[in-house]
């Protein structure tokens, strides 16, 4: 987890600024330590034990704002985790940050709250669809995986444009 946070610091905060992350989880290192202790005591807590993940800022992660990339929701703090977050945490995932998205979850990766997310390979280009922050974060090696949400190529386009693999979930 520390390696990913150091990379984010070097390339997102001090470096070329891809602008793929809205917020970092201030408790990520403590969660990693808790999982290390659990592993020593009884083994893996689940198949994603200790895997750093970025969540598209469209799903609630308790303790982190959910803004939908819009100034309209800049102060929204959810009281609990979204269902998918609960399941991933139960499998041992560590959420290290919230990824940028197209405002209100639509269109290109641009929002009134954070501006535009850039393509990792060409900072003059976009990162793709509304899950572009998730795609750019994984491509930049800011996390081992990310969660996006598919509408109209919202996962597929950022995956292709950022040189990573994306899986479009089935509906339902």
Label each PLM-derived region with a short phrase:
Residues 1-74, 105-106:
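Short, well-ordered alpha-helical
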Residues 75-79:
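Glycine-rich anion/phosphate-binding loops
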Residues 80-172:
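Short glycine/serine-rich loop segments
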């Amino acid at each position: 987890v520390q390696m990913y946070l150091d990379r984010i610091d070097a390339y997102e905060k001090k470096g070329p600024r891809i602008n793929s992350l809205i917020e970092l989880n201030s408790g990520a290192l403590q969660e990693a330590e808790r999982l290390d202790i659990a592993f020593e005591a009884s083994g893996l807590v689940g198949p994603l034990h200790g895997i750093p993940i970025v969540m598209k800022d469209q799903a609630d992660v308790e303790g982190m704002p959910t803004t939908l990339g819009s100034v309209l929701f800049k102060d929204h703090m959810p009281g609990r985790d979204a269902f998918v977050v609960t399941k991933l945490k139960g499998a041992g995932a560590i959420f290290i940050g919230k990824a940028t998205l197209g405002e209100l979850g639509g269109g290109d990766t641009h929002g009134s709250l954070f501006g535009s997310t850039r393509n990792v390979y060409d900072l003059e280009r976009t990162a793709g669809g509304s899950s572009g922050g998730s795609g750019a974060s994984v491509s930049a090696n800011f996390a081992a995986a990310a969660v996006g949400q598919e509408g109209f190529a919202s996962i597929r386009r950022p995956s292709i444009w950022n040189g990573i693999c994306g899986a479009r979930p089935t509906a339902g």
